[in-house]
Amino acid sequence: MRRLPELRSSYVVNAEAWDWSLRVLDHVDVHASDYAESVRFYETVLAALEIPRVSEGNDWTCFTNLNVADRQPPTQNLHLCFYARQKEQVDAFHGAGVGAGFRSNGEPGYRDYAPGYYAAYLFDPDGNNVEALYRDIGNVGHDASATLK
């Protein structure tokens, strides 16, 4: 059995503790033009969603199902959407990213894409659109005038 390399992050959980039944994709690879900055971005924003860094190597880092790799050419024009279990996690995702100096692509709020669609968007260092989404089924009749477009 392959042994995981020693991790450098303080935000690491035991991979055994992750609920692997939550997976819909096995994994997604994002190739980064600035590997260290991309790892900083994903670690910052995914911590707000309780998505852990579970393993890493010399030129890759795995956050459960997302692999960030120091590869060329960098991934571009990608839209990644991460599920949030609470509305507050969407707010925390956006706040953590903006607070760390990353660019917003849409503040937290309800969208008219679907009833109860509460989301926020950030650009990763390569310009990919990264979203956190909470499907607020208890608020499907939200005030349309408060909906962000």
Please place each PLM-identified region on the residue numbering.
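N-terminal beta-strand motif that seeds the catalytic metal site of vicinal oxygen chelate
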Residues: 7, 11-39, 80, 136-149
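Long, continuous compositionally biased terminal/linker segments
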Residues: 15-19, 64-100
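Vicinal oxygen chelate
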Residues: 32-36, 82-126
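Short beta->alpha transition motifs characteristic of CBS
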Residues: 28, 114-115, 121, 132-139
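Core segments of cupin and vicinal oxygen chelate
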Residues: 29-67
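Glycine-rich acetyl-CoA-binding "A-motif" of GNAT/NAT acetyltransferases
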Residues: 129
